[in-house]
């Protein structure tokens, strides 16, 4: 008999069995294996830095993902046609259960969504109404948060704020709007579609001939420059086509910070219009996941709360004679999700006729508006187009150029590139976008897809079986029970068939079954009542990236907090301090150099200067410089060194600053000083000020003006730090009204202004009301 894997053996052995019974089940095994738990593997994990940044053209990986979404559509001609579809009907024949499939069964999905609605209609209605009220009061500038966003007007990937500015400039020009709430922004998009004509500016690449002197010889050379081009659309059909083109455009990147994978994956970034729709969808589902009734969703929570839910949800299982726990892996998650299925789910939730048919109370009035917004979101998603981006670098002996994704350039492509390009070119349009009606792209609708999968848990449950699951997007863990072995098998097959009918494919190779209370979910490993987070993704030891002294201090203060909360013991604290300090040194390339400063004891050198760490588990709540000063206050050379480091007049030291924040204890705004006094090693970030073109200079000038305007606005109206205003009034007018009211209030309590002061106030009001062009929200 072959020996079984020891890890498998430890999962098969039950408590309460004799040694002989266990050996009959699994064969001979080492004595100690009975008590082996997850703690035995924790030391195998190494805390390392993330892999390097992804470089190269994203087009091959983007094409791979899009082609897979077509390939897994098992309808005739892969569901392509005038109206591409992913839903499977009875007339299409037997549903393909046995292969990876991107189709969802229409009638089965309807029944599952109805059963989910019957159980959760009250919480769905509560969250719908709360979300609608939030849309009316939330400022649309939430879209400025984020590193990269696709700017579809200029076909470039830029910081989110820059892409938002381009879209809002067009909206303001034609709709004369000043400020936007989220709801205003969505309405403005629809009003743009109705315009009879439109003129807008876009940036295009052009060639400019320049004179260049080299070695006394003047030559004419062509140089690539970016220039503004004015586009004039004179018909509503052209306006609609252009605006819809903007709203469906994506770009793709190669995913950096990837876990232990050899091959890179493509991720996508939407345009600001579609990002707004996706934000609304995600926020609703994140809020839904926070509700107590949604016991299976953990997408909205983290930390101790999430850990408790991972343990508590399986505990709600009705135990039977036969019980089992599955650690699941969904294969081809993004490629197989269908925008139509998302739309169907929300349509059923908010449909008056379906509610009436099921005998449920009517949805709130706001549900009709939410229903229309969600219909539009998934319509745009089903018409998405992904920009392939720059091509590979090609060169000969003297020149280099970038490949273009055109049929004419096939002669320059190697076999591997040619293979995928010939498959994708039928979906490629003249602007360089690939049409991708099926599936999702990585990073989209994580919370929405979590909710989409939940109806499968209870549908078609029979007496004598039970099922509980915890899910966060494509990661899930499920417990099953059955009164008989046959019922347990039927329960497992029922659940995975239900998921299959929703277009979710559970991998047979990667899904593992264990005894109850043993499994892995979102890198949290469960072993009985103990759940712990292991893995290279554990972020507690990663430097913050502010500057060396603050990052070192952060390592120590986080360790002190962990000790106080009981998260780590003193041994764990020592490890955490050592690894954390070492990681910060590595990030800033700080070498540990004993005897670096002549005459200064090595132990007095600060960490940022290559000195040793002063911390251990008993003193990590104290700042580094205070510890080193107390230790060396009798040594004049050490104290002189520390005084130089701490000298506030040092030209390289950032000025001390105060931060205005809201105190929950005092229920008011408070001024708080920075936790650590600034010193010589508090480096300042120097931003790249290179002006490559006049357009870049204009962008930078606009950014400086915005920062100055916001600084003035926050000084005049400190409450704006607490709540971002979302009204349609110009900032300048609001500031003028507040200044006038403040001056009037002060005079009413006996404060007298001199003539010079009154002149200054009148000048400020005149500037704000007449000379100001601060008209953004």
Swiss-Prot record:
GO biological process: viral RNA genome replication
Recorded catalytic activity of this chain's protein: RNA(n) + a ribonucleoside 5'-triphosphate = RNA(n+1) + diphosphate
Protein origin, superkingdom: Viruses
E.C. no: 2.7.7.48
Primary role: RNA-dependent RNA polymerase which is responsible for replication and transcription of virus RNA segments. The transcription of viral mRNAs occurs by a unique mechanism called cap-snatching. 5' methylated caps of cellular mRNAs are cleaved after 10-13 nucleotides by PA. In turn, these short capped RNAs are used as primers by PB1 for transcription of viral mRNAs. During virus replication, PB1 initiates RNA synthesis and copy vRNA into complementary RNA (cRNA) which in turn serves as a template for the production of more vRNAs.
Family that this chain belongs to: Belongs to the influenza viruses polymerase PB1 family.
Subunit structure: RNA polymerase is composed of three subunits: PA, PB1 and PB2.
The protein's name in its UniProt record: RNA-directed RNA polymerase catalytic subunit
